[in-house]
Amino acid sequence: MAAGGNGAGGDTRAAFARIYKTLKEELLTDPAFEFTEESRQWIDRMVDYNVLGGKCNRGLSVVDSYKLLKGADALGEEETFLACTLGWCIEWLQAFFLVLDDIMDDSHTRRGQPCWFRVPQVGLIAANDGIILRNHISRILRRHFKGKPYYADLLDLFNEVEFKTASGQLLDLITTHEGEKDLTKYNITVHGRIVQYKTAYYSFYLPVACALLLSGENLDNYGDVENILVEMGTYFQVQDDYLDCYGDPEFIGKIGTDIEDYKCSWLVVQALERADESQKRILFENYGKKDPACVAKVKNLYKELDLEAVFQEYENESYKKLIADIEAQPSIAVQKVLKSFLHKIYKRQK
Amino acid sequence: MATAEVVVANGSGGADTKTAFKEIYSKLKQEMLEDPAFEFTDESLQWIDRMLDYNVLGGKCNRGLSVVDSYKILKGVDVLSKEETFLACTLGWCIEWLQAYFLVLDDIMDNSQTRRGQPCWFRVPQVGLIAVNDGIILRNHISRILQRHFKGKPYYVDIIDLFNEVEFKTASGQMLDLITTHEGEKDLTKYNLTVHRRIVQYKTAYYSFYLPVACALLLAGENLENFVDVKNILVEMGTYFQVQDDYLDCFGDPEFIGKIGTDIEDYKCSWLVVQALERAAENQKSILFENYGKSDPACVAKVKDLYKELKLEEVFHEYERESYNKLIADIEAQPSKAVQTVLKSFLHKIYKRDK
């Protein structure tokens, strides 16, 4: 029963939620800034609105990975706190990216509510709020990890992953801009690069890297693990692209608009590779338009090219390659971490 | 002659420091464009190249150059070695990069039109709100530069913590400015000296005044926790600097200050309007309530006439003299002569400036 108290699945979530409250309270009383009542209320609301509301899979996976690396079912109180805190830093990082992405994409809703910049009184103040969210990570890390031998490594890790993600976002923005003029600019290399940098590093590599640092490891010795996780993250994003078009809106929680938004989606890239001239013309004439008739023509073409079957084959091959790469890793604990990630996403429907 | 050549080659005098500073920008930019942490496409390289030149260059670089000047004074030398020059200039550029990041985002949030005589970056065709991500890239470049050139130095973590803390204070000050302006648009009496001071302290003073000297102190091997008095003096100086800015926005010569001030139109929590609110009689307050924050030139003129009526130019000059006297007294109470020299150097660059 003691084991249960310290971190079985349900209890991990409860601890995770409690630690959010601790961290937020610390940020709202940060001695580095003299808060006014208005500014404290603003940040309180802003943080709840943007950091909460997701599934917290990235954050929780730091705790899960750390347990697997330690070969323990239960973590000590301090260990739980540190792992959850790093997990929340990743959730804060994602919140920062999403707030700014929504502004740049001119989006309307996020997780079933208006995007933060759409909220009355907020508008483009949201850009500074995104910056505040990013700065909260540095404040949290300094408060709880300064003095740890891996503190500088944590700072470098978060900074490097942020740099890769922002660079991937830049690539996405200017590629879409270029693609709107010439759809043939969309290809598998460009798509691979965008998803690798924009999503895979912070969603897959970062949680495991945090767990490795907590375990006292040197990340320079884990280049293979980084590569596997980036590959897994790429596969995850291809699934996202597929589900945007083929997923059940009831399940995925939104109506996909990649076609309307002129996205460099894996589906359109595959279509361009397989289409003959007349089919390509259908893409050139209908991709990136809001008109439901145009969207339907693109979807019909995807069916004609049998892209669902292409995706199934891609998924099967990706899974096999990932499993082979994982099982080539010398550490059994690391293998377990990587398989745990893979099995959470394999053949998911949302 | 060898000595003279070394002196010239290594950066004596203002002009040579500026030359070295400029050369180091080119080197740092090249490193950013070749960063192994990202696979650049030609399009993304061209974009970042242009974005950097547009936003990081173009200012006077006073903040950046003051790292070098301060470091020389702290070391008590006229000449720095090549390595010392490089490290000091690099930290100076990190501050310029930091300011560029803030200004790109501030211009978006303020819906501004021009910056340093050219359209704001987000106004440039093809850019628009991609500028938000460009701001983030600018911030990330600082971390990349620091990791590349300072990792392995005993003060590496201290530099990162310093930049992170100053960034946090600046973003928090910006937030305070944004929500205060929002509140003030509904109720001008929300503007007061305490709020104004807090905004300018956090939004400007830490990164413009404290950060350059703190960088020089770290380069000199100092522990910043032993220099809290220095921090307080520099924050006070930065506050005075911003009050000057507020004054010059309204009373400065546009030819000199390089822009036409719009604090009145923009409903800014300016030191001038705060002083006016403190001194105005009820009917004068009504003039402020009815005319402040409007673009109509007639309304602006009424506010300016009221500022004259309340003799705010004289109030400012008295404030300036008192600030100077207090700052000099605080500086001369510092135990280190080198630190005194650094602080006086900063103060004399800004005292009674007219742009």
Curated annotation (Swiss-Prot), chain A:
What keywords were assigned to this record? Cholesterol biosynthesis, Cholesterol metabolism, Cytoplasm, Isoprene biosynthesis, Lipid biosynthesis, Lipid metabolism, Magnesium, Metal-binding, Steroid biosynthesis, Steroid metabolism, Sterol biosynthesis, Sterol metabolism, Transferase
Q: Which residues are listed for isopentenyl diphosphate binding in this entry?
A: K55, R58, Q94, R111
Query: PROSITE patterns this protein is in?
Result: POLYPRENYL_SYNTHASE_1, POLYPRENYL_SYNTHASE_2
**What Enzyme Commission number(s) appear in the record?**
2.5.1.10, 2.5.1.1
Pathway in which the depicted protein is active: Isoprenoid biosynthesis; farnesyl diphosphate biosynthesis; farnesyl diphosphate from geranyl diphosphate and isopentenyl diphosphate: step 1/1; Isoprenoid biosynthesis; geranyl diphosphate biosynthesis; geranyl diphosphate from dimethylallyl diphosphate and isopentenyl diphosphate: step 1/1
Q: Where is it located?
A: Cytoplasm
Binding positions for Mg(2+) 2 per the UniProt entry: D101, D105
- Specify which residues bind dimethylallyl diphosphate according to the UniProt entry for this protein: R110, K198, T199, Q237, K254, K263
The job of this chain, per UniProt, is described as: Catalyzes the sequential condensation of isopentenyl pyrophosphate with the allylic pyrophosphates, dimethylallyl pyrophosphate, and then with the resultant geranylpyrophosphate to the ultimate product farnesyl pyrophosphate.
Q: Which family does it belong to?
A: Belongs to the FPP/GGPP synthase family.
Q: What is this protein called?
A: Farnesyl pyrophosphate synthase
Q: What organism is this sequence from? A: Zea mays (Maize)
Q: Which gene encodes it?
A: FPS
